[in-house]
Amino acid sequence: MGGSEACRGLAFIVEGATEKVFYLEYLSQLCAAKGLALRKDLDTQEDRYAITSANGEKVVMMASVNSVSQMTNSATWFDRACVGENPEIAWTVFLCYDTDEYNSDITKFHEGDWAMLRESISPAAQKVVDLAAKADIEDVMLCDLPGVLSFLGLPPETEMPLGNKGKTKLKKLYRKVAPNKAY
C-alpha cells in the first residue's frame, strides 16, 4: 500500500488505547456497512490502514497519545508519519478525546495548548475535526453492552459488572476474557 496510490488521508489522534480500539472498530463497521475494505498495512511499524473502494484508496493513520495532556505533542507525529511519509495526500485530522464528564465545557479544547496543536497541524491538514465524547469513552461504549460482549467474545447473557465508572466495568468484562493480561 504505497502513499502514491491514495489521494486522501484520515489521521486519528486518540487519547488512549481504549479510544483507539473504539474508533478503529467503529471505522471497521462503517466500512463493512458501506461495502468498503479496511485493511492494516503490515509493512510498517505505524498504525496504518487503507480503505479501498471502487473510487480508490484512502490512508488511515492512528496515533494513541495515552493521555489527553500529551495530545498537544501529536503535531510532531502528524508531520513525520502522515505528511512527511505522504506529502501528496490531502489530510483530515480527527482529534478523538473524551471530556470525562457529560457537562464539561468542550471549548477548553480550543484554548491554550490545544489552540497551538490546531495551529501546528492546520497548514498541512485540509480539515481538523473534533470527535469528543461528552463522558468517559468507556461509558459511551457500554451504551451498547451487547456489542461490547460480542466484541469481547462473551455470552450475551453476561451481566453488566458493578462499579461507578465505565472504565472499571469494562476492565472487569475484559478480565473475564483475559484474566492474566493488563487491560
Segments and roles (model prediction):
Residues M1-E88:
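Short, surface-exposed loop/strand segments
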Residues C7-R8, I89-W91, P123-V128:
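Short glycine-/polar-rich loops that comprise or flank the Walker A/P-loop
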Residues A11-V14, I89-S104:
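Acidic beta-strand-to-loop metal/phosphate-binding motif
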Residues C96-A182:
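Activity-critical C-terminal alpha-helical subdomain
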